[in-house]
Amino acid sequence: MNRHIFTYLKRNELTDVGLVNRLFISAFIQHYHLMPQRNALLCKYVIAEESAEYEKLQAFDAQLSRYGCEYSLEDLTELFEFVISPSDRKISGAIYTPKAIRERIVDEVIRGLDQTQLLHKRFADIACGCGGFFLTIAILIHQQTGKKFADIYRDNILGVDIQPYAIERTKLLLALLALMNGEDENFDFNLYVANS
């Protein structure tokens, strides 16, 4: 993610979790010309043109365009981690794990599993943060087995985090991943707010 975007976010002191989530999700949906119809979670985060927040969305989107940001799911994951307050970061130990490191860890975990085992294996992250590891795992299972994301979320993923916003952001990221792959539905997530 471009450092200018981080500077923009700091300068505008975006601290309201709900607004930040709506802003990031709406910008992502707008950027990729997506429009969820059936996924109630994503629909809840879309900023409408008549909304008072629409001007902030346009300003944020202009920054993304100005600095040529791809605004991938990976960028969105990094942004979600960036806006965690320093006090929350200290309490929860939240830290962004880069994609390359996540991929290496996941590769180590699944090494030796055949396709049938991968279809039925359950992956847990008991301090899942914004769900970066689950993005990596879901993509890998989908690519190697063809399993629908809805089924992966229901059968293969179990996550816990102490912060409610982290679980919400994990759900949002996974829902966007599915939407980008043609799955626009409500999902049964095994993601829970708890102190592990």
Residue ranges of each PLM-predicted region?
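Non-catalytic nucleic-acid substrate-recognition regions in nucleic-acid-modifying enzymes
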Residues: 1-72
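SAM-dependent methyltransferase catalytic region
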Residues: 37-44, 49-50, 55-62, 66-67, ...
